[in-house]
UniProtKB/Swiss-Prot annotation:
Membrane topology label: Peripheral membrane protein
UniProt key word Lipid metabolism: no
Location relative to the cell: Cell inner membrane
Protein name as annotated: Putative membrane protein insertion efficiency factor
UniProt keyword list: Cell inner membrane, Cell membrane, Membrane
Function according to Swiss-Prot or TrEMBL: Could be involved in insertion of integral membrane proteins into the membrane.
Keyword Membrane: yes
UniProt main location, coarse: membrane
Protein family per UniProt: Belongs to the UPF0161 family.
Lineage: Bacteria, Pseudomonadati, Pseudomonadota, Betaproteobacteria, Burkholderiales
Length: 98
């Protein structure tokens, strides 16, 4: 599924994007954001992140620099830790109180 989404994004960048012009208010562009989100977070979560980004990209927003949040950023904020090569999702770690 991940490969299919990446292929569709590439087709969009090559075939459609040049004709539509540059309209994205963010950097990286929404299509680049979608590509990075799918690569870093997988097909399902990456697609959801890309859809949320597209909803934020409208004429009434200021735009600017909006990178894809990395796995290490999310884990530090949520307290959930997972190695990318692990065959499971994030695991909540509860540390004993001192």
């Amino acid at each position: 599924m991940k490969r299919i989404l990446l292929a569709l994004l590439r087709i969009y960048k090559i075939a459609l994007s040049p004709y539509l012009g540059s309209r994205c208010r963010f950097w990286p562009t929404c299509s680049d954001y979608a590509r990075e989100a799918v690569i870093q977070h997988g097909a399902a979560r990456g697609s959801w992140m890309a859809a949320c980004r597209l909803c934020r990209c409208h004429p009434f927003t200021q735009g600017g620099y909006d990178p894809v949040p990395g796995v290490e950023t999310e884990t530090a904020q949520t307290g959930k830790f997972a190695h990318p090569a692990a065959g499971h999702g994030p695991v909540t770690v509860r540390l004993p109180r001192p």
